[in-house]
Amino acid sequence: MTKYVCTVCGYVYDPEVGDPDNNINPGTSFQDIPEDWVCPLCGVGKDQFEEEA
């Protein structure tokens, strides 16, 4: 699965890990995360993430 990087702080969303602290289960693709989810480190929205190169 594709990882996504926060362009503001560099946090990497890894679908294999998810974001359990914010109720995103492992195996959840970035596209399937709710639109109101924010970066757990800096708080920006999904629109500030880019696919990892």
Swiss-Prot record:
Listed Pfam families: Rubredoxin
One Gene Ontology MF term: iron ion binding
Domain Rubredoxin-like: 1-53
GO aspect biological process, one term: alkane catabolic process
Domain of life from the UniProt record: Bacteria
Record keywords, A-Z: Electron transport, Iron, Metal-binding, Transport
Needed cofactors: Fe(3+)
CDD domains per record: rubredoxin (cd00730)
Cofactor descriptive note: Binds 1 Fe(3+) ion per subunit.
Iron recorded as keyword: yes
Positions of Fe cation binding: C6, C9, C39, C42
SUPFAM superfamilies in the record: Rubredoxin-like
Record function comment: Rubredoxin is a small nonheme, iron protein lacking acid-labile sulfide. Its single Fe, chelated to 4 Cys, functions as an electron acceptor and may also stabilize the conformation of the molecule.
Family: Belongs to the rubredoxin family.
Protein name: Rubredoxin
Species, as recorded: Acetoanaerobium sticklandii (strain ATCC 12662 / DSM 519 / JCM 1433 / CCUG 9281 / NCIMB 10654 / HF)
Organism ancestry: Bacteria, Bacillati, Bacillota, Clostridia, Peptostreptococcales
